[in-house]
Amino acid sequence: MSTAKPSDPANPTPAKLILTVIDGMKPTMVQRAMSSGDAPALKAIADRGQYVPGCAAAFPSVTPVCAATIATGVLQDVHEIPSMNWYSRAEQRYVEYGSSFSASRRFGLNRQLVDTIFNMNATHLSPDVPTVFETLDDTEQVRTAGTTYLIYRGRHEHEISRDFALTRAASQLFKRSALGPRELFYADIFASRKTSCWSRMGLPGMRDQHAGCVGSYLVENDLFDFMLLSLPDNDAHSHKNGPHAQIQSIAAADAELWRVMEAGGGTDAFLDEHAMIVMADHSHSSIERRIDLTGAFADWRVLPPSGAGARHAELALCPAQRSAMIYLLLEARESALTSVVERARAIEGVDLVMWWDAERVRIGGERGELSFAPGDEVADARGRRWSVDGELDTLLAHVEDGVLHCDNYPDGLTRVWAAMNCPTSGDVLLSAEPAYEFPDWGNRAHVRGGSHGSLHRVDSLGALLFCGVPAPPQRTDGNWSIADVAPMIIEHFGAA
């Protein structure tokens, strides 16, 4: 077991804590990497603490939604980041966080960058929910730090760095500051201090080494108590090469984590003094076929990325890898809803369709249909209670001893309920069958590679490892969610 300082409220100096997010880390792949010796840093953490092979993502299981949940400890019914691509009813336009370069070009590169780098934190993320950075900053006793991560909102103001020609150009283009942790290093755009670290503006393949460089610098110079260390390159590698190629990219991420540990005196000395949480935001599954979402609604007036003809548009379509959302832009929404749901359920590759039916959420698919809402009829595996009507086989679920088990769609009711109750979500949500993906607005898909986004377990269950910090009492029986991590961190520092 870890000998790091315990997270005891009576202890005035809890151990420093690093939350490391390895984007898309698949449990079977991290287990193989640890067994083969390709992930010695992860194995050291698991050996000292606990390894959880199944931690449920949010739904849609895409990075912006999951990053917001990890950073806040709540799902999107509270944090309000609905997907990778969504439609803003308030601004009557699409919001695109970078599904692909081709998609970003269609929406406008400047708009996409502003939405992703600034608006996601400043306006899209609910101002009513604090991030872990904000909660710890408010104590005025915990020094916070973060590397390039989508959700970085804290209490400290940062100006755009002028260390490189590109960032000097960015400072002229964006002309704005951002609120983040005390030490913020975001793709060269924000850099609290001058270091030798460079990410080439956050290019895939360069981001992990940038995080390792920054993390090592922060360790060597004793500049944090809590650090979020983001290692995102595994996701891009898995998208391109498929999830079963992850051992190579997990090994690369592990090497940067090892680098950070070496900066603190080596693995044993480092883990004696630091609590560690390493997690995936979601998993990955193999992709073989594309889903023709736009073709299915070719006879409807669909709002294009340019926004042209917005006054006459009937639908906004928002594909996000293995999930999608449909927004009804018509005044006659009720009559349109029935037609849209019927059309969506007939699309090849669509597994589940979700929509509102009065005060209940309805889920339909080839195996049947059910509706549900919070109630007192049955408990799920995490203890939440529900009223459920219809065919449980819709979610391949069953009830045993008064508990609803939904192994193929982990924490399924809670995740769907949060998605449907998110005020910025679409009116109809879609989840793809295994092996299928919705191409983005740039017509990019990951056929013969990997992807994620659906409600299904193949995308939803990521790996979690931790040492030096205890598991919450209610999680001793498993059934973890990525929403459990922020409360662990806040409790560790006595900031609850």
Role assignments for model-derived ranges:
Residues 1-51:
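Active-site-proximal N-terminal segment of extracellular/periplasmic enzymes that hydrolyze or transfer
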Residues 33-37, 160-165, 242-247, 289-299, ...:
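Short secondary-structure boundary/capping segments
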Residues 37, 53, 60-62, 84-121, ...:
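Secreted, luminal/periplasmic, and some membrane-associated catalytic domains
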Residues 74-240, 372-406, 425, 439, ...:
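His/Asp/Glu-rich, glycine-adjacent segments
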Residues 205-229, 234-276, 416, 484-486:
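A long, amphipathic alpha-helix that forms part
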Residues 301-331, 449-492:
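Substrate-binding rim/cap in mid-to-C-terminal beta-strand-loop elements of soluble/periplasmic
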